[in-house]
Amino acid sequence: MRELKDFLEAIGATYEPNGERLNVNVRRFVADPEVAAQIRDRGRLVYAGRLLGRTRGEFIPGAGLLHELARMEGPNKVWVDERVGWLFACGRDVFAESILRSEGELTEGTCFLVMLGGDCLGYGRLESQGEKTILKNIFDIGDFLRRERGLEENR
């Protein structure tokens, strides 16, 4: 689960999942040790315990993990208003001037959780594009809906 550790390090979080970590295909889970032992005995798995996220080159956190990280002290966070939050959830990037406040140093290459009030909408990486500084959207809560819409259009 090196990818999970890399993700947590990138956003400045010191998070240790309670339970045993399980890899099922590209998905990463955590389950109680007793449950994990029973799961392993069953053979072929599809889902096991609580989803942390999936790995496709890099770790993509699940909504549950983002929710947990949002409640913690320590991870880098930026807060946006409702309009910017909606655009971010639709896959758009955040301009630096749209950030209302932040926890963590706003330096290029740093990853931040994007917050709307107490809710985490996803995360991004601070980048420069010419004269502008943006928070590049890496993952947002609208990802699932966009993937589902793509499946519907392909039917």
For each of these PLM feature ranges, what is it?
Residues 1-155:
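Polybasic, low-complexity RNA-engagement segments
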